[in-house]
A protein has these predicted regions:
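Membrane-proximal periplasmic segments of bacterial cell-envelope enzymes
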Residues: 2-295, 300-315, 321, 470, ...
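Short loop/turn motifs at secondary-structure junctions and domain boundaries
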Residues: 66-71, 353-360
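Conserved, well-ordered alpha-helix/loop/beta-strand core segments that scaffold catalytic motifs
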Residues: 210, 313-355, 362
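Solvent-exposed, polar/charged alpha-helical surfaces in well-ordered, non-transmembrane soluble domains
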Residues: 106-113, 117, 223, 227, ...
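Short, gly/Ser/Thr-rich active-site loops of penicillin-recognizing serine hydrolases
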Residues: 575, 692-718
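Beta-lactam-recognizing serine transpeptidase/beta-lactamase-like catalytic domain environment
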Residues: 87-88, 93, 307-322, 333, ...
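A short acidic/glycine-rich loop-to-helix N-cap element
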Residues: 681-691
């Protein structure tokens, strides 16, 4: 039985072995068939590539597409509120160079030499070349002679100092440069220097970015270069731009400035601009309006793609996206008014300069109290240059410099008294010198007025009334020769109300670097509260003073000052101002925490200042047809400038006055203009320069209004 079982098992194994043998050849055949199909497909595809698509692929092998080249476009323009151009773009015929990838210094030199035959470089560009520039150029022109400047022994010394690789190359290069003599540099001809100036411009920027070689080329140069572009790889002729100011220096400091292509992007903001598709050498707004509205003014660059061969030669250029000039800004400023305001400032500074040597600046702000639009933002400053007196634009001083403003802030003091219930309308105090324990000098008005109420106090500018109001806010009744016990909380309380008018806080103007003024000493000295109440403690800017007066003029709404009125598209015709893209709506920053009847009561006091016989401003403003109201101011201070003329023999700052003025018109209807005048560091507090300037600028505003009553509007694109 065992033997039979073994025989059966042997037969089974033989059957299974036969089955396996029959399966293996079948699988091999399938595999060979698949391989055959794959090879057939590859052969067919190769045939297609060689026979059908061969020419196409040969062309693709011989060329490559480089990165997109961006070409800058003109910035947006700026117009005044009447549609007159303030900032324009002057077109300039320009020669540029775009360095392609793979182009070496020898190829650049060839192009520079060919270009030097066609254009003449400005002397200033050649004067900017450094000795290092010239030595490097000499080495490029005299490679064999330059190589002999450093011996193998020199290199061996460096290696002994364990200097190898790139560091060794750098040391060798520096030593070669150092050993070039002045005689060898003198071998460079005038033509060589001109070639070097061109080459330096060509190498100044970044690859694939057009670099300006020469701007404002002559018509002949532009023509001959354009004709020879085929033999000048990388060179192009185009029309560039530079900022142009039809009104010269008027408002220039506020308009801001634009960087040059050499300055390019600021290092501290490089990443910010690069992620926004700027090139490193792009021109951008550096300051104020140009900087604040960079995103609006910059525009969209034209982008094109250069198709090149293996050698880097451009076969053709394909435009990817069409460029678009920046959008335009319509400012709130009235340029005709601005000119007249600046003329007034300059005229008065010149007239008073001989008798007022410390008085070197003056400011005016005019704004619409209903919407916050700035109508004029003007400042002038006397500087000594080249041994003579010059007057420069200092409009920025209206928002970045601050001064004690004197009695112009008394309206805020009275209103703070009302709101804290320290006083009421028509509250009376007796105006006479006030004496306090520990003080040798009395606190008094410029004149003793006797029994007066709040309106009379504003009209004649009583200091004593304001002192009593401040004491009442502090919870103190005046007793002669008593000590003052005023806590810091009273300062905080008064500042709370002053700040509601914009005094001591940002005005919110759409420009950077605004000053909020300076607080007086923070230690708790009671007498300083009295100084604060008459504007002789904290400092404020001329713009803050104008916002304060606007807030009173419009019934208690603090409006955000705006210098840009609209953003407009580029028009199709130059005489148009473009369609409105965005209008800047008026912004109410806050409503003052004061009863409207209180504000109107103070406005009556301001009317009396300008219109009643013994008002401090009546001598200048009484009876004028445009019915102005406001407040004069005189602050005792010390010289705050840098000139030695403001210091005595012991180097102490001399005492002087800040003369100020603020107001609005008309007083008997909705006021349409509010203004401030600040003239710091005056010797003679009776000079009246503040009132003279104030009248001149108000006259100018209403004269222009009359002249324009029948004028035709500026055309707007449809």
């Amino acid at each position: 039985m065992k033997r039979g079982r073994k025989m059966r098992q042997k037969k089974e194994k033989q059957k299974q072995s036969k089955k396996k043998k029959t399966h293996i050849p079948f699988r091999l055949n399938v595999l060979f068939f698949i391989v055959f199909l794959l090879f057939s497909a590859i052969i067919i595809q190769l045939g297609k590539v060689q026979i059908i698509d061969g020419e196409t692929y040969r062309n693709e092998v011989n060329k490559k597409e480089d990165v997109t080249v961006s070409t800058p476009v003109p910035r947006g323009k700026m117009f005044d509120r009447e549609g007159k151009v303030i900032v324009n773009n002057k077109p300039l015929r320009t020669v540029t160079y775009t360095k392609m990838k793979g182009v070496d210094s020898k190829e650049v030199l060839i192009v520079a030499r060919n270009l030097a035959k066609l254009i003449e470089m400005p002397q200033e560009d050649m004067d900017k070349l450094t000795e290092t520039d010239k030595k490097d150029f000499w080495m490029q022109l005299n490679e064999k002679r330059a190589a002999t400047k450093v011996t193998k022994e020199d290199e061996s010394k460096f290696r002994k100092q364990e200097i190898e690789g790139k560091d060794l190359d750098k040391k060798v290069e520096e030593l070669r440069r150092e050993r070039i003599t002045q005689e060898e540099l003198n071998e460079l001809s005038k033509e060589d220097i001109e070639v070097l100036a061109i080459k330096s411009k060509m190498n100044a920027g970044y690859k694939m970015t057009p670099q300006i070689v020469k701007k404002d080329v002559s018509q002949n140069e532009y023509a001959v270069v354009s004709e020879g572009l085929s033999s000048l790889p990388g060179v192009d002729t185009t029309v560039d731009w530079e900022r142009e100011y039809p009104n010269d220096k008027i408002l220039r400091s506020v308009l801001g400035s634009v960087s040059t292509e050499n300055e390019g992007l600021p290092r501290e903001q490089l990443d910010y601009y690069l992620v926004r598709d700027y090139n490193r050498n792009d021109r951008i707004g550096k300051s104020y309006i140009e900087k604040q509205y960079e995103d609006v003014l910059h525009g969209t660059k034209e982008q094109s793609k250069n198709i090149t061969d293996k050698a880097g030669n451009i076969i053709r250029t394909e435009k990817v996206t069409k460029g678009k000039s920046g959008n335009n800004l319509m400012l709130t400023v009235d340029m005709d008014l601005q000119k007249k305001v600046e003329e007034s400032l300059e005229r008065n500074l010149r007239a008073f300069h001989s008798s007022e040597p410390m008085m070197d600046r003056a400011f005016v702000v005019m704004m619409n109290p209903k919407n916050g639009q700035i109508l004029s933002l003007a400042g002038k400053k006397i500087v000594n240059k080249d041994g003579g007196m010059q007057i420069e634009d200092y409009a920025l001083g209206t928002m970045i410099s601050s001064y004690e403003l004197g009695s112009t802030v008394k309206g805020a003091t009275v209103l703070a008294g009302y709101q804290t219930e320290a006083i009421k309308p028509y509250t009376h105090f007796f105006d006479a010198p006030m004496y306090f324990k520990g003080s040798s000098k009395p606190k008094k008005s410029w004149k003793d007025f006797g029994d007066i109420d709040d309106l009379r106090a504003l009209q004649v500018s009583s200091n004593v009334y304001m002192f009593n109001t401040a004491l009442k806010i502090a919870g103190i009744d005046y007793v002669p020769n008593n000590p003052l016990d005023i806590r810091q909380e009273t300062f905080n309380k008064m500042r709370y109300y002053f700040r509601q008018f914009g005094l001591g806080v940002p005005t919110g103007i759409d420009l950077p670097n605004e000053s909020i003024g300076q607080m007086g000493r923070t230690d708790n000295i009671p007498g300083f509260l009295l100084d604060y109440a008459i504007g002789q403690y904290d400092t404020y800017t001329p713009l803050q003073l104008a916002q304060y007066m606007s807030t009173i003029a419009n019934g208690g709404y603090r409006m955000k000052p705006q210098i840009v009125q609209e953003i407009r598209e580029q028009p199709n015709r130059p005489e148009e101002v473009g369609k409105v893209m965005q209008s800047m709506e008026p912004v109410v920053l806050n409503r003052v925490d004061m009863d409207l009847s209180y504000i109107n009561h103070v406005k009556e006091g301001f009317r009396r200042v300008f219109q009643e016989v013994d008002g401090t401003g009546a001598g200048t403003f009484k009876g004028l047809p445009y019915k102005p109201a406001g407040k004069t101011g005189t602050a005792e201070t010390v010289y705050g400038g840098e000139s030695d003329i403001g210091r005595d023999e012991n180097n102490y700052r001399k005492k002087c006055y800040n003369l100020t003025l603020a107001g609005y018109a008309p007083y008997d209807a909705d006021p349409e203009v509010a203004f401030s005048v600040v003239v710091p560091w005056v010797n003679n507090d009776k000079s009246g320069i503040n009132s003279a300037i104030g009248k001149e600028v108000l006259d100018a505003y209403f004269d222009l209004k009359t002249q324009r009553s029948g004028a035709s509007p500026v055309p707007v694109a449809q």
